[in-house]
């Protein structure tokens, strides 16, 4: 009986050690890049829900609030109405909001956009390549991109209306 218990403990210890070792190995050798503040934002091309092409480099000369989100993400859901409310005011001032969904179905994203009557461009990051390029963890994560196309700040987590407005002011050309 004691032999079985000892064997069981050794097996559990080996499994846990292997899991910890694998996690450390993955973290150390991960190829994902971390977005560098002050560097040019990586360009991307997506198609929004209305079929229009969105290419980041086309927004040079404007500030860009790039938001990564998901329909299942409660903090994302809370901040979207604030973004929608502030969008017309800051669009007139040369700021664009682009919301990139984290690889969900078209129907889920379209239903969400319709439910909240979102006015800013929304696209789906099919395959999650843009999220990988920008090193996004967790959702929501947003990037402030200035008129020269440089990333000036990364914002993780849900934002209040007041915080969003401060960020939009920061990237107003």
Swiss-Prot record:
<dbReference type="InterPro" id="IPR036249">
    <property type="entry name" value="Thioredoxin-like_sf"/>
</dbReference>
<dbReference type="Pfam" id="PF00578">
    <property type="entry name" value="AhpC-TSA"/>
</dbReference>
<keyword id="KW-0735">Signal-anchor</keyword>
<dbReference type="GO" id="GO:0016209">
    <property type="term" value="F:antioxidant activity"/>
</dbReference>
<dbReference type="InterPro" id="IPR023555">
    <property type="entry name" value="Thiol-dS_OxRdtase_ResA"/>
</dbReference>
<dbReference type="InterPro" id="IPR000866">
    <property type="entry name" value="AhpC/TSA"/>
</dbReference>
<feature type="domain" description="Thioredoxin">
    <location>
        <begin position="35"/>
        <end position="173"/>
    </location>
</feature>
<comment type="similarity">
    <text>Belongs to the thioredoxin family. ResA subfamily.</text>
</comment>
<feature type="transmembrane region" description="Helical; Signal-anchor for type II membrane protein">
    <location>
        <begin position="10"/>
        <end position="29"/>
    </location>
</feature>
<dbReference type="GO" id="GO:0015036">
    <property type="term" value="F:disulfide oxidoreductase activity"/>
</dbReference>
<protein>
    <recommendedName>
        <fullName>Thiol-disulfide oxidoreductase ResA</fullName>
    </recommendedName>
</protein>
<dbReference type="GO" id="GO:0017004">
    <property type="term" value="P:cytochrome complex assembly"/>
</dbReference>
<dbReference type="InterPro" id="IPR013766">
    <property type="entry name" value="Thioredoxin_domain"/>
</dbReference>
<keyword id="KW-0201">Cytochrome c-type biogenesis</keyword>
<dbReference type="GO" id="GO:0005886">
    <property type="term" value="C:plasma membrane"/>
</dbReference>
<keyword id="KW-0472">Membrane</keyword>
<dbReference type="InterPro" id="IPR050553">
    <property type="entry name" value="Thioredoxin_ResA/DsbE_sf"/>
</dbReference>
<keyword id="KW-0812">Transmembrane</keyword>
<keyword id="KW-1003">Cell membrane</keyword>
<keyword id="KW-1015">Disulfide bond</keyword>
<keyword id="KW-0676">Redox-active center</keyword>
<comment type="function">
    <text>Thiol-disulfide oxidoreductase which is required in disulfide reduction during c-type cytochrome synthesis. May accept reducing equivalents from CcdA, leading to breakage of disulfide bonds in apocytochrome c; following this reduction heme can be covalently attached.</text>
</comment>
<feature type="disulfide bond" description="Redox-active">
    <location>
        <begin position="73"/>
        <end position="76"/>
    </location>
</feature>
<comment type="pathway">
    <text>Protein modification; cytochrome c assembly.</text>
</comment>
<keyword id="KW-1133">Transmembrane helix</keyword>
<keyword id="KW-0560">Oxidoreductase</keyword>
């Amino acid at each position: 009986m004691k032999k079985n218990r000892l064997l069981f403990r050794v097996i559990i210890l080996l499994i846990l050690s292997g899991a910890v070792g694998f996690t450390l190995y993955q973290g150390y050798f991960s190829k994902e890049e971390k977005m560098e503040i002050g560097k040019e934002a990586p360009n991307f091309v997506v198609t929004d829900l209305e079929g229009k092409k969105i290419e980041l480099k086309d927004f040079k000369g404007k500030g860009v609030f790039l938001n990564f989100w998901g329909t299942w993400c409660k903090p994302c859901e809370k901040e979207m109405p604030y973004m929608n409310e502030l969008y017309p005011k800051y669009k007139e001032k040369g700021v664009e909001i682009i919301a990139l969904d984290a690889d969900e179905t078209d129907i889920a994203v379209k239903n969400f956009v319709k439910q909240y009557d979102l006015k800013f461009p929304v696209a789906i990051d099919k395959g999650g390549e843009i999220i990988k390029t920008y090193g996004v963890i967790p959702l929501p994560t947003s990037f402030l991109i200035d008129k020269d196309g440089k990333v000036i700040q990364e914002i993780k987590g849900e934002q209040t209306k007041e915080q969003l407005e401060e960020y939009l002011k920061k990237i107003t050309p």
